Amino acid sequence: MKASSGRCGLVRWLQVLLPFLLSLFPGALPVQIRYSIPEELAKNSVVGNLAKDLGLSVRDLPARKLRVSAEKEYFTVNPESGDLLVSDRIDREQICGKQPLCVLDFDTVAENPLNIFYIAVIVQDINDNTPLFKQTKINLKIGESTKPGTTFPLDPALDSDVGPNSLQRYHLNDNEYFDLAEKQTPDGRKYPELILQHSLDREEHSLHQLVLTAVDGGDPPQSGTTQIRVKVTDANDNPPVFSQDVYRVTLREDVPPGFFVLQVTATDRDEGVNAEITYSFHNVDEQVKHFFNLNEKTGEITTKDDLDFEIASSYTLSIEAKDPGDLAAHCSIQVEILDDNDCAPEVIVTSVFTPLPEDSPPGTVIALIKTRDRDSGENGEVYCQVLGNAKFILKSSSKNYYKLVTDGALDREEIPEYNLTITATDGGKPPLSSSIIVTLHISDVNDNAPVFQQTSYMVHVAENNPPGASIAQISASDPDLGPNGQVSYSIVASDLKPREILSYVSVSAQSGVVFAQRAFDHEQLRAFELTLQARDQGSPALSANVSLRVLVGDLNDNAPRVLYPALGSDGSALFDMVPRAAEPGYLVTKVVAVDADSGHNAWLSYHVLQASEPGLFSLGLRTGEVRTARALGDRDAARQRLLVAVRDGGQPPLSATATLHLIFADSLQEVLPDLSDRPEPSDPQAELQFYLVVALALISVLFFLAVILAISLRLRRSSRSDAWDCFQPGLSSKPGPGVLPSYSEGTLPYSYNLCVASQSAKTEFNFLNITPELIPAQDLLCDNASWEQNTNHGAAGVPFASDTILKQAPPNTDWRFSQAQRPGTSGSQNGDDTGTWPNNQFDTEMLQAMILASASEAADGSSTLGGGAGTMGLSARYGPQFTLQHVPDYRQNVYIPGSNATLTNAAGKRDGKAPAGGNGNKKKSGKKEKK
C-alpha cells in the first residue's frame, strides 16, 4: 500500500514540474504554449488568452485570422478577444485511456503573415468514474484440504480514472476465515487476492458469503462492490504450478495470423483426474483475445490477427492453469511489438483557400498541408511534393508542415479548376508513399467585356406589326462567370427623339429580344437606327455597343382616296356639265385620287365599273381623265352617270369608287330642271322629332292645342307678307324645282335672297317658274324701294329675319373662265404654294354659288357659263387652285382643278369694300338668310 501511494505522489510531482522544466530550457524543444485544464469542462469555457500568450494584439486579431488547425477540434479561438475556448466535450478516459499524462497537441494558424504555433493542453483527470467489477457475483470453490495462507486471485475492479482518482484499495468485510491482499501487475494495475487464514471444514461451513469493496482516491472517494460466494469442496490439495511467473516475448508487427508465440507449461503433483490441467486467459482485455489465441490443452499461444505497432506496442497476457479440483496457478506473458515500415505517410490538408481569384499574384498561399507517418525512426520521416503542375509549388514551413503557393499567372477562362496531386514519401526501405488530390477552383474576375455575335444588325419589319411583337434579337457573349458573365441589354441611343424611343421599341434586358411598342407606319417612319448596349454585372461593369437599323417595309394598308369628284356636305353628288357639241376626245373632267402607300402599293389605275351609256366616254388608265369617246347622239340621254373604280398596285389590291354625274347642256337653264328632279333626301332626325312631338301631343293634347291657338292668333295679327312685296302685282309664287340643301350653304361672301311664300312647308329655296316674255328677269329681285318699305323691326329694335335680305348683284367677270382654267394633268399649271386640298364643303359652296349666279344671268340672256366650248359646266374644279402634297413617285395621279383668280364680290362692291380673295374667309350667309 505504501509503495503504491509513493508512485502516485511521484506522478503528481512530474505533472507539476514538467511544464516548469520545459520553460527553463526553451531552446531544447520547439516553442510551444501549454495549458492545463480539467476534463469535462463546459463548452465555451476559457482555457487561456491565446492571443496574449502568443504576443498578438487584440486589434490585429481580425486581420491575423487566428484559428485552430486540428483533425478534431476540441478548441476554438474567440476572434474578438483571442481567448482559447473549449468547443467540444473532453473526456480524458476516451482520449488518452490509462496514460498517466494526457496532452492534446494542436496547431494554431495566424495569417498576414502566416505563422503556425504549437499548443499543448494537458487534460487533468477528475474523479468522474466509479470502480466497477466485471461480475456482480464471484463463485469460488476451495477444497477443505487447502492450507491456510493459500491465495485466490480475484477479478479486479475497473476504474477509468488515473492518478489519485483511480482505484486505490480493496477491503473485505469482516469474517473468520479469509483476509484480503492487494497485488499489482507489471503494468501497474491493482488486483485483489483472497487469502485463506484458517483451515476450512466443509462439514461445519460448506459456503461462505463475502463482500469485496473497491475504493478510489477521489475526494470524496467512490467505491464499487461485488459478492464472493466460496463453496468448500473435497480435498484436492495440490494446485498446478507454472515453471515461471513471468514470460517475455518479442514479435515483429508484420507476422502473419497463426504465428507461434509461446507455449506455457504448468505441473500438478496430484495424480489422475486432479492432475489434468486446463489453460485459459485470465483477467485480460478483449483486445488481447482479439490478437492472440490460447490452446486450452497444450498452453500454446499463437497470433490471431495482424499486429500493428501503431495501435499497441506491447501486450500483457495473464494465463491461468486449473486442475479438475479447481486448483489454479497463474502467470503473465509480456509481448513486445517491433515496428516495421508498414504505414504509408498521410497527407492532411488543414486549410484550403478556395476559390482562388484568377488575378492572384505568384506566391499566393493556397493551402496548408501537414504530413504524418505512424511509423518510427527513419520509417516515419516524410518528404512531400506536388506532381505534374508547374504553376504550383510546396514550401516547407516547419517539420511536416508545408505551404502550397502559386508559381505563375492563372486564367479561369483557360483552366477553371485544378486537381493538384500532392505526394508524400517516407524514408523506409522500401519507401512507402501516398497522395491526395486537392481540388482548387479559380474564381472569376471581370476581365472580359461582352462581345456581340455581329458587328451590326439590320432587320426588316413590315408596317402594321402588332404592338409587343419581337422584331429582332441581339446576342452578346461574355466568357466570364456568374454576374461577371451575365449580360443585360439596353438602348443607349437612337436617331429618334429621346422621348419617342420608348414609345417605339424596347429591349428585353435578359434575352436581348427587341420588341415593337407600337405598330409602325411606313408612311410616317421608314427607318430608324438604335444603339444597343450589352453590359455585364461585374464591378466595375464592362460593356459593348452595337447598332441596329430597323427598316419599316410598306404594306398595302391604305386604300386609294378620291379627292375629286367629292360629295357635298350632305352626301349629295356634284355635277359636271358637258357641251352638247363636244367632239370626241374632249376632256370632260378628271378623277383625282391619292394613295398614302409607296411603290407598287401606290401605283393607281382607273377603271369604269358602270356607265349609263357604254362607249360614250373613255377613262385614262393612269391619268383618270374622262374624255368623250364619240359625239353625243340624239338618242343619248342628257344625264349620264359613270361609276369609276380606283385600284392600287398592292397584293391584294385596294380600291375606291367615285360616281360622276355628267349633264350635256349648253346653258345653266337646262341644268336646273334636272336638279329639281332629284328627290329630296329624307331627314331621319326630322322624322324622329315628328314622332316625339306626336307622342308628347298625345300626352298633353289640350295644353298644346291652347298654346298653338294662342300663337296662331298672335302671328295673324303681327305677320307681314314681306316675301309677296318683292314681286310686281299680279305675280304669284308656287313651289318650283328644288335645289339640294347643300346649295344653300357655303363660305362664299355672297347673299342670294329668294322670295319664299309664307305658306310654303318646304325648307329649301324655291325658284319662280316665270315666262320671260311677260316679266323681266330683274323683277325677280327686290329693288331698293321695295326693300325699304318692307323692313320691319321688333319691339326691342332687333331686325326680323326678313331684315337681312339684301339685293343681289349680277356676277362679275371673275365667273368667266379662261382656257387656262380647263382641267389638265398635274404640273400643267403653276399651283399656289399656299393652296390646300379641296374638300367637300368647298366644292359644294362653289357649285351653289355658280348655280345661283347662272340663274341670275340666265334671266337677261347674258350668261356664258356652260354655254361656251371652253367651259366645263358646273364642275367644282373652277374653285381656288390647290397643290397636292404627296410622294413624288405618282404626281401624274394628282389633278389640280381651278385657278388662282381672285373672285370679286358683288356684295362687297355694294358695301364699298374690296372683293375678297378666293382663299379668304367666307361668310356663311346662306343659312342665316334661309332662316
UniProtKB/Swiss-Prot annotation:
Where is the secretion signal located?
Answer: 1-30
Segments traversing the membrane: 692-712
What GO CC terms are in its UniProt record?
plasma membrane
Q: Where does the record place the region Disordered?
A: 814-840, 901-931
Which InterPro entries does the entry link to? Answer: Cadherin-like_dom, Cadherin-like_sf, Cadherin_C, Cadherin_CBD, Cadherin_CS, Cadherin_N, Protocadherin/Cadherin-CA
Instruction: Pull the Extracellular topological domain ranges from the record.
Output: 31-691
The terms under GO molecular function for this entry are: calcium ion binding
Task: Name the chain's protein.
Answer: Protocadherin gamma-B2
Record organism: Pan troglodytes (Chimpanzee)
